[in-house]
Amino acid sequence: MPFSADSVTSLRQLADALAARSVSAEELAREYLARIEQAAALNAFIHVDAERTLAQARAADERRARGEAAPLTGVPIAHKDVFVTRGWRATAGSKMLANYESPFDATVVERMAAAGMVTLGKTNMDEFAMGSSNENSHFGPVRNPWDTSRVPGGSSGGSAAAVAAGLAPAATGTDTGGSIRQPSSFSGITGIKPTYGRVSRYGMIAFASSLDQAGPMAHSAEDCALLLNAMAGFDPRDSTSITPAQGGVDEDYTRLLGQPRAGATTERPLAGLRIGLPKEYFGKGLSADVEQAVRAALAEYEKLGATLVEVTLPKTELSIPVYYVIAPAEASSNLSRFDGVRYGHRAAEYRDLLDMYKKSRAEGFGAEVKRRIMVGTYVLSHGYYDAYYLQAQKIRRIIADDFQRAFAQCDVIMGPVAPTVAWKLGEKTSDPVQMYLADIFTLSTSLAGLPGMSVPCGFGEAGMPVGLQLIGNYFDEARLLQTAHAFQQATDWHLRRPGKA
């Protein structure tokens, strides 16, 4: 019987099949490229270069033949189009960069290539990672594989849809205010945002530099741990990368998977784990279907030996205004370089240099990006800096301190990723504030720089996936992944696929 990726449920199985020569990297790449072509209506990919992909796959096969294969050699991966890639376009979902090709690879892309992974293409995303639905892309919206009339989440919606639909076994994403966790939840996959600084930002087109963080998106916690092993580590080219002296040491993120906690048993592997439930995450605004799925997941954790503890994160509501001051302020600075001279689209007709700047930016940026640039410029302007930006930074510190008080009472925090399941395409586009409010449960984690992840935990309205959010303390990714893996060993939500749920 010929090999089919449909029979594979994890990256480890895929790696084992490659190692056993049940399939070659080239055969695997061809299978996924065919799937991408067949599912073009999802609009998950912006750029596919089959010849380049197959050349990488053949190189992986040659590496294996020489006995030089790493654990992930030959395994395909899709990259969010916010990472620059030599030889591929890197658009950030924007007309401004529609034809941009980078002369170098982002560190994340470089490290995945060093691990032998094969790039399938560049995935669609909200323009410059600004959005929660993947409707802000210059290249059109991405459709959710579970219901193509709904959004996949954003801004890493193309990556989430690609993994959920089986167009790629794994993908890279970025998370500034929830852009790995929320689309993972909406699309029924697993994704983790590491501690800020764990993964290099070098070559990642910046949105908000103090918040942006790259991470893996796949089907399971084990997959994410394997990917994080390849992805994470100190990078001297990124000034925000955590140095070894600061705690950014290389580690094996798979080391705790399947291991009971100290003093626990195999039947109750999480005995002694204290799960903090922020009361602010279970109040008004949380839909009943999402709460039901999350509560059922928490009950499963109790069966695994964990205890539930109520904690408080009193400034949760303030995370929205704080984020939407700080992130646009940083975006207005970062995006100033896209002026038609240094980078990006240049208007065809203009009177003088100033007119060229204005027309190039007006034509090159979409509505949401323009909105955030204007907000950011305003809050940084003379007379408003202290009232808005400085005040937001002070509250950001309070939010981080609130998490530390909560972690004094628990080991991991859990709750919903989003207040609802994925909404219909176009449902919120006319009301940006409603779109922003959908990020209520993910923003504070990003503001604090903490690691957080989403794991599938059930289904809600219209059979749409629901994600459980797990939040850890700084550098606690291995424990988060262990905790998520234990849940996935006891349940099968992460094995469900669109059309087969």
Curated annotation (Swiss-Prot):
Purpose of the protein? Allows the formation of correctly charged Gln-tRNA(Gln) through the transamidation of misacylated Glu-tRNA(Gln) in organisms which lack glutaminyl-tRNA synthetase. The reaction takes place in the presence of glutamine and ATP through an activated gamma-phospho-Glu-tRNA(Gln).
Active site positions, chain numbering:
K80 (charge relay system), S155 (charge relay system), S179 (acyl-ester intermediate)
Q: Which GO terms describe its biological process?
A: translation
Reply yes or no: does the keyword RNA-binding apply. Answer: no
Question: Matching HAMAP family, A to Z?
Answer: GatA
Q: Which Pfam families match?
A: Amidase
Q: Which GO terms describe its cellular component?
A: glutamyl-tRNA(Gln) amidotransferase complex
Q: Which family does it belong to?
A: Belongs to the amidase family. GatA subfamily.
**Assembly information from the UniProt record:** Heterotrimer of A, B and C subunits.
Query: Which reaction is recorded as catalysed by this protein?
Result: L-glutamyl-tRNA(Gln) + L-glutamine + ATP + H2O = L-glutaminyl-tRNA(Gln) + L-glutamate + ADP + phosphate + H(+)
Q: What is this protein called?
A: Glutamyl-tRNA(Gln) amidotransferase subunit A
Return the broad EC class: ligase
Please name the PROSITE patterns in this protein's record: AMIDASES
GO terms for molecular function, please? ATP binding; glutaminyl-tRNA synthase (glutamine-hydrolyzing) activity
Its organism's taxonomic lineage begins at: Bacteria, Pseudomonadati, Pseudomonadota, Betaproteobacteria, Burkholderiales
Q: Which UniProt keywords apply?
A: ATP-binding, Ligase, Nucleotide-binding, Protein biosynthesis
Taxonomic source organism: Cupriavidus necator (strain ATCC 17699 / DSM 428 / KCTC 22496 / NCIMB 10442 / H16 / Stanier 337)
Chain's gene name: gatA
Q: What is its EC number?
A: 6.3.5.7
Query: Do you know which InterPro entries this protein is assigned to?
Result: Amidase (IPR000120), Amidase_CS (IPR020556), Amidase_dom (IPR023631), AS_sf (IPR036928), GatA (IPR004412), LisH (IPR006594)
**Is Ligase among this UniProt entry's keywords?**
yes
